[in-house]
Amino acid sequence: PSLSNPAMVLIDGTSGEVVYEKNAFSQRKPASVMKVFAGAVAIKHLDMQSRFTTNISLGVNEKTLVIQGSNDPWISLSHSVAEKMDRASLPYLAFNTLSAVKKSNKGSLKGITILYSKLYSQDVSNLKAFWAKRGFKPVMKAVSSDETLLNAGEFIVGDESPEIFKILDYTIMWSENNLSERLARLSARAAGNSFSDKGVAQVFEALLVEYGIDPSKLVTKDASGLSKENRITASMMGQPLYQLRKDPKYSLLYESLPVGGVSGTLRSRFLTTAPGAVGLVRAKTGTLNGTVTLAGYVESTDREYVFVTLADDISRGAKSSAKARAAIDRLLGRIAAPNIPAVISETPTTP
């Protein structure tokens, strides 16, 4: 079969009754369905209206620069991607900084110290690499936010991100891995945990516990779902999806989910596989080699259902993934149809 013994659960969105389940408590790879947890903890712990700022200035002391960061997840590592999406890019900030250093030091790039706060280690590494290629090798020194504030002089270049709710919407809609990782770490820190994968694991577990769900089968190695060592169960994902849907605070998560045949990572799904379900499915997609997952909501005639499908034992390769996606689409097509079948099978009925 296309789905090769998947883990599945179908929950009545009105009553919370489990309508169908298969391997619902079996540990499976979530792939990017993991981002549902990242989105939920971001809404819970971060101010959705706030923005991130990054400001770069000449230092008050000679031969110093100051970068006042705020762990902005939105700054793109790629300039071309940034231009397409109207985002600031690390190369843009780095280039403008380099020009200002030359101007203030009569063309010299030697003996410069950069004091910085709240930058991701990956961003620091990328800045160093960008500058090193251009002959600029400053001493980079991590300091507190207060210290950068005290040492900042003439402003050079900066950026302000959109509100966090817009960043989260993009993250879920397009399954952006880097943003998911960074938002989850920010959420972990806001919840009082460490700014690390371990902190993320703790904040995900706390979310489950809050809804009375046993987190013992959750294995969190990252927040994006890229790690093949992540593990969830279909029930563990389905129950929070049911609970979150009832809480107006989490409406943003629901609205950010791609719509089948219409938007985001589901824009090309259902169009040929289950045309009757186009516009009726809102869900988070997931794909790894040998794994295809989907979790979210499907509208039927008189109610909405919560569903989770974790097929993590399919054959490797693009063809198998495409077949698995089509099989999941057809299943949801049958649920979206006027009468929900008494038994959900993996094999589509032939007309």
Feature-to-residue mapping (PLM):
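Beta-lactamase-like hydrolase cores
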Residues: P1-Q27, Q49, L90, N96-K106, ...
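Soluble periplasmic/extracytoplasmic beta-strand elements of cell-envelope proteins
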Residues: A7-I11, V19-E21, F37, N55-S57, ...
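Solvent-exposed coil/turn segments that connect beta secondary-structure elements
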Residues: G13-S15, N23-S26, G59-N61, S70-D72, ...
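Active-site SXXK
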Residues: G16, P30-M48, T171, F307
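Small-residue-rich helix-loop
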Residues: V19-E21, A190-P351
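Short, well-structured active-site flanking segments
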Residues: H45-E62, V139-V143, Y250-E255
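Conserved catalytic neighborhood of penicillin-recognizing serine enzymes
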Residues: N61-N96, E154-A184
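A small/polar active-site loop signature that marks catalytic segments
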Residues: S99-L252, S256
